[in-house]
Amino acid sequence: MDMMQFQRQTTQLAMTQRMQESLRILQMSNADLADYLTAQALENPCLEVRVPEGASVAPALPSRGIQAGLDRDAFATVEGQPPSLLAHVEAQIDLAFFDPGDRRTALAFAEALEPSGWLGQPVSEVAAAAEVEEEEALVILERLQALEPAGLFARSLAECLALQLEDLGLLTWELRTMLDHLPLLAEGRIADLARRCDCEPEHIRENLALIRSLSPKPGEAFAADRTPIQPPDVRVLRGPEGWEVELTRAQLPRIRVSEAGDTGDRQADAWLARARSQARWLERAVERRQATLLRTAVCLVRHQADFLDQGPRALRPLSMEEVALELDLHPSTISRATATRLIETPRGLIPLRAFFSRSVSSDGPEAPQSQDALMALVREIIAREDRTKPFSDDAIVKQAKLAGAVLARRTVTKYRETLGIPSSYDRKRAAAAA
């Protein structure tokens, strides 16, 4: 290998490492970024970092859960601290499981959760504890895996990641194949994976970036001691001309690059030059992080302003791909920018990803609607029914039409079952028994 080729490969390797580091920085919370930069400053005399002293933390609220029956109108500022993982899950179970037997089994699964959010016991053991058949327990588990945050109740890392990708509407055959071969990913065997997926290695690398943006332990967003994990990175306020988005700069570490002069020692000066170059790169990487996060949040708020004004019924269909296209970024960049982040709103703290919502084709000539909004509507209609005369699915279709939503009966049935709401017959029987 000649010197020119060696230098070219060395430069490419350095660029790849910096790209990976830049992606890591993008995904860090403000607190993680402060820790990271502080550690870098200890090793780099040209990097000065000022970390703000403890700032106030806004009260946290449950994460996105319309699909599991959690009404986002409940996102209102509350006193106190965020719930533990168990409390968060139990709150969703109370809303999603009407049948007492199903709820008992669901709570048994909740008790088996590890702090990571993974299921800590075999399904057979949970079924035995709940005194139900294993097949019945598996049905309940599938419903629990639709709760938020996505990835809870997984039995393996691959399943945890697959649940998150499915929730985002991004789970392709290629990604599923990659998750089925995680050891190859860990070993960096890109070529082998490309052959198995019948695609180019570059496509594997793009998918790998998306996988790395996911949370392997979604339960860690909650604390057993009920203390906030992290403050919001972004806030949205109502201004004179509409909603205004800003970064929570009180939480942001400040960087300064020292321009110390030469020492007169060739080796020392060369080392200082490299340190100064690294410090400047870190400064630019943090600036890019802030700009990407702010642009993404502004785009989300612009598209979902009605959600902030009116609540979950006003959510519009919006995907990561649409936002990425609008901002001229890769979807994996949007995924990283929004992963685990909270935005402070007049409704309280909300996961930034709550602003995404899957599109559902209308059963009529109307434009596609948000699945979350339609499911919220179905739940709202059922919540206000006369318990002794519950609405049938056909009646819900008529009520939805009065609210301006065109739904087929089969769609109502699907949403009702996803929400864990029994049929009108079973609801009437339960009301009579009560």
Curated annotation (Swiss-Prot):
Residues 319-338 bind DNA. A motif (RPON box) lies at residues 408-416. The lineage of its organism: Bacteria, Pseudomonadati, Pseudomonadota, Alphaproteobacteria, Rhodobacterales. GO terms for cellular component: DNA-directed RNA polymerase complex. Sigma factors are initiation factors that promote the attachment of RNA polymerase to specific initiation sites and are then released. This sigma factor is responsible for the expression of the nitrogen fixation genes. The open complex (sigma-54 and core RNA polymerase) serves as the receptor for receipt of the melting signal from the remotely bound activator protein NifA for the expression of the nitrogen fixation proteins. Pfam families: Sigma54_AID, Sigma54_CBD, Sigma54_DBD. One of its GO terms (molecular function) is DNA-binding transcription activator activity. InterPro entries: RNA_pol_sigma_54, RNA_pol_sigma_54_core-bd, RNA_pol_sigma_54_DNA-bd, RpoN_core-bd_sf. Keywords: DNA-binding, DNA-directed RNA polymerase, Nitrogen fixation, Nucleotidyltransferase, Sigma factor, Transcription, Transcription regulation, Transferase. Belongs to the sigma-54 factor family. This is RNA polymerase sigma-54 factor. One of its GO terms (biological process) is nitrogen fixation. It comes from the Bacteria.
